[in-house]
Amino acid sequence: MRCWLENLSGGRKMKFGEFGGRFVPEVLIPPLEELEKAYDRFKDDEEFKARLEYYLKSYAGRPTPLYFAENLSRELGVKIYLKREDLLHGGAHKINNTIGQALLAKFMGKKRVIAETGAGQHGVATAMAAALLGLEAEIYMGAEDYERQKMNVFRMELLGAKVTAVESGSRTLKDAINEALRDWVESFEHTHYLIGSVVGPHPFPTIVRDFQAVIGKEARRQIIEAEGGMPDAIIACVGGGSNAMGIFHPFLNDDVRLIGVEAGGEGIESGRHSASLTAGSKGVLHGMLSYFLQDEEGMMLDTHSVSAGLDYPGVGPEHAYLKETGRCEYVTVNDEEALRAFKTLSKLEGIIPALESAHAIAYAMKMAEEMQRDDVLVVNLSGRGDKDMDIVRRRLA
């Protein structure tokens, strides 16, 4: 198999093929260059690595188990393993990245972090990491998400963060990102923008991917120990794409199908979805060239998903590259399919997944119909479903 990692280093090339880059106002070039130099310096620093490993183990709860879902496997007639990122402190994979970036900010001498959040998971994880490391935190949240994720808003405030609801635009994640970028322009001398996914201008997609790659590194060792070799496929949900990139990246050079599941919402034909790789086109937003849901003039379209964390009109540039080159496959699951998978996993395994993760479970259930009994699927269970209880209760009533 072609050595994909050589082509996906990011680094000073700033791009993944034609995707990525640094499409930002001139005023943001200095902080981005400062961040790139700091990351290049500290990522291999022994003290930085030791402290990161310590916090991931003793604070976040790594390594997470690779759980053989015995009941679900029996029901579907295929072996299904779940990478249990839902068991991390905070209930999702987001803490892998926030601890890494908050620690980097600390090593850079920054006093404050800002972040955007959709479902609230990244905001909570940022507030946790900031509290842990003694940093001031402000979280920007689209007003629509602010209303439907009130419990996470309370959590962030309890953890000491200031939460700002963004009323502009479509009042969702993309608008929260815009506000965070505006803040950073004015405050970068003492503030680090702790971006939550593999999106944004270089070097953010590379930094976030590297901090999330611990998922795939662990899963690779664990599946070899459990099955004696590689799985047939790895499945993960894709919004911005950080949990998927985290588990995919260490497997890029292996003979394994890598499948990203986008939010199909009410169906692609309806126009009410968040599937930018499936139905989008190339464009520029938030400092990067990637695939976006946009009209002919390049204006971003409104998105929809039952899952707030997948409700973003674009996707990380590395995913765009992996789609273009054919290394990864990207599919969709609609709201109803995700809700059915949410119920199925809860009843069969006693595990309540996040609605984001339920999209990946739903596609694994679809795939199982075409597979053999000894085939092996690994699903990244990126988060737990506590935050989604009210939404699911209303939808299933």
UniProtKB/Swiss-Prot annotation:
Keywords: Amino-acid biosynthesis, Aromatic amino acid biosynthesis, Lyase, Pyridoxal phosphate, Tryptophan biosynthesis
Transmembrane segments: none
EC identifiers of the protein: 4.2.1.20
PROSITE patterns reported for this sequence: TRP_SYNTHASE_BETA (PS00168)
One term under GO cellular component: cytoplasm
Pathway in which the depicted protein is active: Amino-acid biosynthesis; L-tryptophan biosynthesis; L-tryptophan from chorismate: step 5/5
Catalytic activity: (1S,2R)-1-C-(indol-3-yl)glycerol 3-phosphate + L-serine = D-glyceraldehyde 3-phosphate + L-tryptophan + H2O
CDD domains referenced in this protein's UniProt entry, alphabetically: Trp-synth_B
InterPro entries: Trp_synth_b_CS, Trp_synth_beta, Trp_synth_beta/beta-like, TrpB-like_PALP, TrpB-like_PALP_sf
GO molecular function, one term: tryptophan synthase activity
Enzyme category, top tier: lyase
Superkingdom, taxonomy of origin: Archaea
Residue ranges the record marks as coiled coil: none
Cofactor: pyridoxal 5'-phosphate
Modification N6-(pyridoxal phosphate)lysine, positions: 94
PANTHER family listed in its UniProt record: TRYPTOPHAN SYNTHASE, TRYPTOPHAN SYNTHASE-RELATED
Role summary: The beta subunit is responsible for the synthesis of L-tryptophan from indole and L-serine.
Subunit structure comment from the entry: Tetramer of two alpha and two beta chains.
Family the UniProt entry places it in: Belongs to the TrpB family.
Protein name: Tryptophan synthase beta chain 1
Species of the source: Archaeoglobus fulgidus (strain ATCC 49558 / DSM 4304 / JCM 9628 / NBRC 100126 / VC-16)
